[in-house]
From Swiss-Prot:
GO molecular function, one term: U2 snRNA binding
Record has ATP-binding as a keyword: no
Domain of life: Eukaryota
Gene Ontology CC entries for this record: Cajal body; cytoplasm; nuclear speck; nucleolus; nucleoplasm; nucleus; ribonucleoprotein complex
A Pfam family annotated for this UniProt entry: LRR_9
Primary location class: nucleus
Protein name in UniProt: U2 small nuclear ribonucleoprotein A'
Organism per entry: Arabidopsis thaliana
Gene Ontology biological process terms, A to Z: mRNA splicing, via spliceosome
Domain LRRCT: 123-161
Role according to the record: This protein is associated with sn-RNP U2. It helps the A' protein to bind stem loop IV of U2 snRNA.
Length: 249
């Protein structure tokens, strides 16, 4: 494991990314704990902490500039309930392939006032009953969940389903019963990694953006490109035949 020191931060790659935001690349360092991010001097729009071994989403300094946090392929099981106090302008958060299990574990994200884009793909939490509706209910500012735009119909359904305190208490009750399962999951080292898109896939995504016919499709593809996801149905040209074939999920 590698400690996240000021020296590591200063020596790590930093650049303007595909959407012209200043990004700090801290991925793949086996970092176990978030610390010393004050050394960034709040100079970045995006911080990429993907492919590390972080267990708790906490210990951030006040970063007024940070808008995007990429922390997929880690071991996140807990989120600081006051996270929003330190990241007031965070609008995009990628928690793909972590170890969030129970619905109530995302409650702390409600403290982030401007959160609009969230990915929880490949967490066990997504398998829970009414997962999507619960997240929509708790995170009022959210516009896109798991790369799918939230519809007005879903907001209404979520509001209706969780209109009573009893409904939320039932969710918390189920969560308490599964605390032991959460611990066992957190100790399991066999969590598969999500494979990042290849150079060919990135080019195909960019081409798809250019050829898109709707604003919604452009937004979906841009988010996929930004967060390192491969959209379903992406067409990859075959250089040997000049034919194109859709990507399998």
């Amino acid at each position: 494991m590698v400690k996240l020191t000021a020296d590591l931060i200063w020596k790590s790659p930093h650049f303007f990314n595909a959407i012209k935001e200043r990004e700090l690349d801290l991925r793949g360092n086996k970092i176990p704990v978030i610390e010393n991010l004050g050394a960034t001097e709040d100079q970045f729009d995006t911080i990429d902490l993907s492919d590390n071994e972080i267990v708790k989403l906490e210990n951030f300094p006040y970063l007024n500039r940070l808008g995007t946090l990429l922390i997929n392929n880690n071991r996140i099981t807990r989120i600081n309930p006051n996270l929003g106090e330190f990241l007031p302008k965070l609008h995009s958060l990628v928690l793909t392939n972590n170890r969030l299990v129970n619905l109530v574990e995302i409650d702390p994200l409600a403290s982030i006032p401007k959160l609009q884009y969230l990915s929880l793909l490949d967490n066990n939490i997504t398998k829970k009953a009414n997962y999507r509706l619960y997240v929509i209910h708790k995170l009022k500012s959210l516009r896109v969940l798991d790369f799918i735009k939230i519809k007005a119909k879903e907001r209404a359904e979520a509001a209706s389903l969780f209109s009573s305190k009893e409904a939320e208490e039932e969710v918390k009750k189920v969560s308490r019963e599964e605390v032991k399962k959460v611990s066992e999951t957190a100790e399991n080292p066999e969590t598969p990694k999500v494979v990042a898109p290849t150079a060919e896939q990135i080019l195909a995504i960019k081409a798809a953006i250019i050829n898109s016919q709707t604003i919604e499709e452009i937004a979906r593809l841009e988010q996929a490109l930004k967060f390192g996801q491969v959209p379903a149905g992406l067409i990859i040209p075959d250089p040997a035949t000049n034919d194109s074939a859709p990507m399998e999920e």
